[in-house]
């Protein structure tokens, strides 16, 4: 998830966005481009004391789908989509 992502300045955020756009313009998927840039940022800030874990994947392991929705909320599969088909 967002484990170990450091706080970035506005300028660093802009540079990251530009790199993501560059990778995408070269044919890389948005997900791959984001993952690559995030890995680069994590590596660059590896010993940065501000880079602290925000979420760890195991934080979500003990929860089930019903923990994240109301009991009266219909499943997405049960909702008729007028645009489908």
Swiss-Prot record:
Pfam families: UPF0181. Residues 55-72 have a biased composition (Basic and acidic residues). Residues 73-85 have a biased composition (Acidic residues). Residues 50-85 are annotated as: Disordered. Belongs to the UPF0181 family. NCBIfam families: PRK05114.1. This is UPF0181 protein YPO1774/y2534/YP_1619. It comes from Yersinia pestis.
